[in-house]
Amino acid sequence: MKKFLSLTLASIMVLGLVACGQKAAAPASGAAQTKLIMCTNAEFPPYEFKDGGEFKGIDVECAKLIGEKLGVEVEILDIAFDSLIPTVMSGKADFAMAGMTVTEDRKESVDFSHTYQTAVQTIVVPVDSAIQGVEDMYGKKIGVQTGTTGDIYCSDDFGDESMERYSKIIDGFQAMKSGKIDAIVVDDQVAKAIVEQDASSFKILETAYAEEDYAIAVKKGNSDLLNKINSAIDEMKSNGQLKAIVDKYIK
């Protein structure tokens, strides 16, 4: 059996002033770029989320640190997950960083940086559920976040008729709590962050199905930016800065 791997445009919220539909600013010939636009989906704790109107999370802090190393400001564009790659392809953002798994299909549309984090797809069910593993999920309603690898591979394994898709995964948890779906497939750290807040309602199954590599997506052919991002990631790995950020959010 294939292992699990980890739409309408959502409202756009920008740190700073970015006009709707505006492309990422290109510097004048010979001028240094002073700002990069990062698109993300801030509904994916602990990687990206909003707290009191402020963007926080592993990806947010990593992106800001990369910006510091490159000597540029990083501006955040908050959009639906399935709009991230099209936004990078169109030039409306310089890069996407959103707990995004590297897949062969996605590599046809964008270029990916070096891996900065790995994750595991996991299954979450109601605390009193009889579901113990993947073999019990056939014929059940399964919730996923639209456009994620969980969506892609669950659709393949269980059929489209079994899927319930949500632009915000937290909406899936609310649906499961009210009995509308039977299980959710989501990245393990996201599952932990949500279940910790409501352990009386949900439980995470012990079986892990696959590891996934997270990386930053840039427009195909933008080797200059990709090389700079890769250098920053490599430095953050070697000097412990990346681990410090991850450890801050994942205990």
Roles of regions detected by a PLM:
Residues M1-K35:
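Short, low-complexity disordered leader/linker segments with a strong preference
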Residues A24-A26, E73, T149-S167, F202-A208, ...:
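Ligand-binding clefts/hinges and TM-proximal coupling segments of bilobed small-molecule sensing domains
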Residues G30-G99:
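Extracytoplasmic small-molecule ligand-binding "clamshell" domains
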Residues A42, Q117-V125, K192-D234, K251:
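Periplasmic-binding protein-like
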Residues V60-K69, D128, K141, T146-T149, ...:
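Extended ligand-binding regions for polar small-molecule ligands
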Residues E68, E73-D136, F202-K203, T207-A208:
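Acidic, polar ligand-binding/catalytic clefts
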Residues E75-T87, S129, T146-T149, E164-S178, ...:
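Short helix-initiation/N-cap motifs at beta->coil->alpha
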Residues M100-E108, Y153-S155, D182-E211:
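A ligand-binding cleft/hinge motif common to bilobed small-molecule-binding domains
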